[in-house]
Amino acid sequence: MRRAAVQLVRLRAVSQAQAAVAFGVAPVMVWRWDQALAAGGVAGLVPARRGPKGASKLTPQLAARIAELDAAGKTLREIAAATGVSTFSVRNALGRVASAGQHAAAGAAAESAGLAAGDDDAGQGAVVPVLPDPVPRDGERALARWGLLGEGAVPVFTPGARYPLAGLLLALPALEGTGLLGAAREVYGQVKDGFYGLTATLLTLVFLALAGEPRAEGATRVPPAALGRVLGLDRAPEVKTIRRKLGELAAAGQAADLIMALARRHAAARPDALGFLYVDGHARVCYGTRIVQKTHVARLKFPAPATMETWVTGQDGDPVFMVVAEPSDSLAGELRRLLPGLRGIVGEGRRVTVCFDRGGWSPALFADITGAGFDLLTWRKGPAPDLPAEVFTTVTCAGDRGRAHQYELADTIAELGISEGPRKGQTVTLRQVTRRVPARAGATRQIHALTSRTDLPAGEVCWRLSSRWREENYFRYARTWFALDALDSYAASPDDPDRMVPSPARKAAAARIRQAEAAAQAAEAARDAALLQLRSPAPGQAAYLSNQVINALAAPVEAAWRELDEADQAAAAVPARVPPGALSPDMARLDAEVKQITHAIRMAACNAETALARALDGHYARAGDEAYALIREALIISGDIRPGPGELLIRLDPLTAPRRTQALAALCDQLTAAGARYPGTDLVLRYEVKSHPTPA
């Protein structure tokens, strides 16, 4: 190319400027080529080798010496002076130079030494390329297209450095503890043949959730090649593929079985965390044009179209399982429906305590709970007589995290009458623990807790019931990070025509009755005041009461009572409950199958993240405040992935601060000791963290 440019200029076929434009160089470069050809012939046009002209000084022995000095706490300048190389070469040897500049010939030896530092014990001392191309999977994709591959491609990892999202692999040991993959295999068995099998699909959704993109649409914001590398594939599935796979699972109609299988595994892995189960309803607000039944949304403080769900969490606030509640059903009704499922999760004969708020208030339900072999803990609803001040004592209780709580408590017994169901007329006797708290203007008020547990100290009764807010904390956290309220499917079906819902006309009729009652009372008060004035005239003034006067005063009262009678009759004619079609012919129920599947996946992801955060306890000074933030940072950090004989080494890059890197290193030691395997392979997972850069 250079010789051709010079010859064209010498033949005056083109000018020097035209040749420069044609060959994409500056005019001065064409002139230099002319001078080089004249001075050295064709050999003078051959570009010289860039970079160092000799062999690299960073031999394996020198790189090992640099690593020893770095481990001894020497600075970069001290190491450079001791080894006779530059500080830049020291950084190269320690792997602290950005990978973009490490492909040059002069830095090849430095990159090899830097990436291999500390890995000799694993036999990984060879050069590892930065972001290599994945293993081609075109043949497997072609087989999958014709249905000949079977269920999913096998994960294959390419040794490489600086893989984005390598930190997501930290979640695999904790995810194994949740039992998600095993539960899904138990429920669904083998899914439809394709390149992405059941395990790859579930791992994709879990990794997306942990990367901050829990919805299927989040796959558009995560590079598919980057996510594919941690899946052991050439690329991750796209949004349409994820939706299709979710649709295939939903078509089986076994989402509830998946959640129950996941709950049984949770109970088997953490039986001590299920001594107290917190149950509460959650309103998932629905936005859009579909007509969905309205329900009261506590966080919005007004009714809105919503789907009701009932959630059960352990005593630590970790989600155990959930069910889609029946529309218009109360928490008391849902609790009664959940009792057989709870027994199947905790096992026969085990007596756990079910905790819930006043929404589950029902003496008949209390009898059902204790009759089913459970204990209960709840707040008392409705007015109750205050206890005298002398029965209260100050009690100190230590929580499960060592924090002391002080209460003013009174311990008594309460008998509640049952006014409904087959136990109507019976009574249920419960222990009542009353707490006295400050109120406005220096006053006090009393809050009553009811329980069937007689063995618990009064302070623990109060603390356990207050800990119900851990479930609310999960709702808030999952709404922010795990798309708790997201609409994962646009499918809907007509509402059940045989279902009965409260009639809005009943409310209007009751309001008319209240207005008529108020009008009748006002008319009677006006009549009585007029009669009193006529019967008590001023001194010296005569008063005459005739039938005409009395009838005139009584006429408004009689009219008001007639209005009240008419309102009562009209209200009696209005049915208390009507079919949904009577309110709106287009009333619909949103699809719950896909949502339950995504709930199960995100519950497992959240529990895995929580397990990692708890593992930092004792290794990170601010774990109580920053554990989750550190885990979220670690999950999206880059790192090296090195498959070896029977193992998969994940060597992560350091975090933003040395103290956080040290905490991550302690976490990696725990995860390595767990001996988990990458799903679908026999590769044992090993974790390491690169040392944090030391300023020169």
Language model regions located:
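Short alpha-helical "recognition helix" segments of helix-turn-helix
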Residues: 17-23, 79-81
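Dynamic "connector" segments at or just before major functional cores
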Residues: 1, 114-302, 310-329, 336-345, ...
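Short, Lys/Arg-enriched anionic-surface-contact patches
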Residues: 1-2, 47-62, 190-197
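Short, amphipathic alpha-helical "recognition" segments used to contact nucleic acids or chromatin
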Residues: 1-14, 59-74, 202-210
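An anionic, glycine-rich sequence signature occurring as long contiguous blocks
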Residues: 135-148, 321, 367, 372-471, ...
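Key DNA-contact positions within bacterial/archaeal DNA-binding proteins
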Residues: 28-31, 88, 240
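Short Lys/Arg-enriched helix C-cap and helix-to-coil transition segments
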Residues: 42-55, 95-123, 254-263
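Short, conserved catalytic/metal-binding motifs centered on acidic residues
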Residues: 5, 66, 204-205, 219, ...
